[in-house]
Design a protein with these regions (language model features):
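Long, highly charged, low-complexity intrinsically disordered interaction regions
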Residues: 2, 10-78
Length: 78
């Protein structure tokens, strides 16, 4: 699991951004991709979801946003 990924934003799509970190482009799902700018450097705090046939990264601009997300997904029934 990654705590965060830092690098340059290379792509922005409706539900994710692509961030370059040492030559590897990570696709990270974010709540508001248009809050990022291509060519700028960011640190994105990440949550790694591992399922049977899926490995996904979810990202947040702040640690507080990530902590809120972790609290929400810990609620039973969601």
């Amino acid at each position: 699991m990654y705590g965060y990924i830092s690098g340059e934003i290379k792509g922005i799509e409706p539900s994710y951004v692509i961030i370059d970190n040492n030559g590897i482009g990570y696709l990270i799902y974010v709540p508001n991709p248009y809050g990022f700018m291509i060519g700028k450097n960011y640190t994105i705090y990440t949550y790694t979801k591992v399922a049977e046939d899926e490995y996904s990264l979810y990202g947040f601009k702040t640690k507080e946003e990530k902590e809120l997300f972790l609290k929400l997904i810990s609620v039973k029934g969601l």
